[in-house]
Amino acid sequence: MTPTPLDLYNRKVEQGSLQADPHQKEALATLDTLFQRLFSGQPRDGFLKKLISRISGEDIRGIYLYGDVGRGKTMVMDLFVEAIPADTALRRVHFHAFMRDVHDYLHAHPKKGIIGLVKTISKQTDILAFDEFHVGDVADAMILQRLFSALIDKGLIVITTSNYPPQRLYEGGLQRQRFLPFIDLIEQTMEVIELSGPVDYRARELGCKNTYFSPLNGENK
């Protein structure tokens, strides 16, 4: 039986490589539900067709995991990625790198545009996993609305982490009103999970290391 993301988490806790955290475990329970729906022991041939047929008529097409820095969002997502069977067409990428690839494609193939990009991605990918989803300018905002709408229509599963809840994406941005339908799309088609908790694991890890500041002035003392 294929171990689920929560199985992997519990194993790492037992081995002492992770500290048990109820907030992380709660988020992983939701990821487990999606994982088991996708990989419930069905034959692995023709995965994408099976995936589309299994999610037809269902609203949830992915997970949007957000929360403060250092709460373990990336670790939780990576456990989901680690559990996915090796023959699945998976792409795990930092969101900034993904958007750089998007702009490169659109620049190189102006006639194909978003439609061509969607065809290319959907042929190569069943599941997209993004780390640190963020929208910084109006060009990206407009591209994302069209791109993600089309990818979700194609049946792709999207897993992403972000420091911001959907309603705060592109907050205060130019022409943000035109971006609001994309926020609606996220909330309608993805399970939105807040990973909260009082522990900042990133700060704790840095605190265990020797850290040096330069220049040595009053501000850094």
Name each model-derived stretch:
Residues K73:
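Conserved lysine of the Walker
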Residues R92-T125:
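Short glycine-rich substrate-engagement loop in P-loop NTPases that contacts/grips substrate
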